[in-house]
């Protein structure tokens, strides 16, 4: 048989093949495809008979993180994304559903925070646990009533005991990057016996390569090396600078053949 190209991805830098997703619909005439072709990781409907994009399903200055379920019977896609709410930390993961025609996108996890959810088989009920680096976890049982996600709180963490022992949450901060415009998001972890009148040595825990972002976005009462170093008398900083993931392809491409950059221009 004759080989025919159905979808082609190209880039003068690199293609993030590890983030690709495809789902061929029943009948074999259309396929849902994930791509960063417009700089942001989004979902497209591909016409397999013509070998062309039929329509862009998701769009905007934000990224699809993962496709959870394709409900062909109801023509709905369930997925996670970050950066949709411009007033929130762009790395926070939220859960969404959208019609295959690109209409009626609904947020299933409306509260601010980094979310992790577990759904029942037909996605009518789910347990959602969310938190931030500063805010303790809240667990909610949710269901969809029409187009709105309704929730009932099942559990909420109590920090009174660890706070009474001297524990303090890391400080979330933002600062403009090298372009003077794009906000960089990070955390500052101080010792539990921090004295604002004293000077402390600062250690930055750095990762500024492709493929991921490592600054904690969920609640971690003990954050490994970061907490240990802080308790030894250091102030520890973590920051996801240009070259890391989930802020668009141009943001990540800074690291292309340039790992020596390590995001330093965003830190100085």
Give residue ranges: language-model regions:
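Residue position within the beta-strands of beta-propeller blades
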Residues: 30-34, 77-81, 126-129
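Short, solvent-exposed loop/turn segments at conserved positions within beta-propeller repeat blades
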Residues: 36-41, 86-91, 132-135
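Signature of short aromatic-glycine-proline-rich micro-motifs recurring in repeat-based ectodomains
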Residues: 18-29, 33
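A short loop-to-beta-strand structural motif that recurs across blades of beta-propeller domains
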Residues: 42-44, 94-96, 138-140
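Serine-hydrolase catalytic core recognition
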Residues: 114-268
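Beta-propeller blade termini and top-face loops
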Residues: 81, 91-94, 215-218
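Multi-bladed beta-propeller domains
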Residues: 1-20, 46-73, 82-87, 98-115, ...
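Residue-level detector of Asp-centered blade-edge/turn motifs that repeat once per structural unit
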Residues: 26-28, 71-74, 121-122
């Amino acid at each position: 048989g004759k080989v025919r190209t159905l979808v082609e991805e190209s880039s003068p830098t690199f293609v993030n093949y590890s983030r690709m997703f495809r789902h061929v619909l029943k009948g074999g005439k259309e396929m849902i495809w994930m791509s960063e072709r417009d700089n942001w990781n989004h979902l497209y409907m591909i016409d397999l008979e013509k070998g062309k994009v039929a329509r862009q399903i998701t769009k905007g200055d934000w990224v699809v993180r993962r496709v959870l379920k394709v409900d062909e019977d109801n023509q709905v896609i369930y997925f996670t994304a970050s950066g949709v709410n411009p007033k929130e930390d762009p790395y926070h993961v939220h859960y969404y559903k959208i019609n295959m025609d690109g209409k009626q996108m609904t947020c299933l996890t409306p509260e601010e925070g980094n979310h992790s959810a577990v759904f029942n088989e037909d996605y009518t009920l789910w347990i959602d646990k969310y938190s931030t680096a500063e805010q303790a976890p809240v667990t909610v049982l949710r269901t969809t009533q029409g187009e709105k996600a309704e929730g009932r709180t099942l559990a909420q963490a109590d920090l009174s005991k660890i706070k009474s022992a001297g524990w303090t949450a890391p400080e979330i901060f933002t600062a403009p990057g090298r372009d003077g415009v794009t906000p960089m998001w990070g955390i500052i972890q101080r010792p539990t016996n921090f004295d604002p009148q004293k000077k402390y040595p600062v250690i930055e825990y750095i990762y500024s390569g492709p493929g991921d972002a490592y600054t904690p976005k969920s609640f971690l009462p003990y954050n490994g090396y970061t907490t240990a170093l802080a308790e030894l008398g250091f102030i520890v900083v973590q920051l996801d600078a240009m070259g890391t993931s989930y802020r668009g392809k141009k943001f990540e491409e800074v690291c292309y053949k340039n790992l020596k950059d390590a995001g330093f221009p965003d830190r100085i």
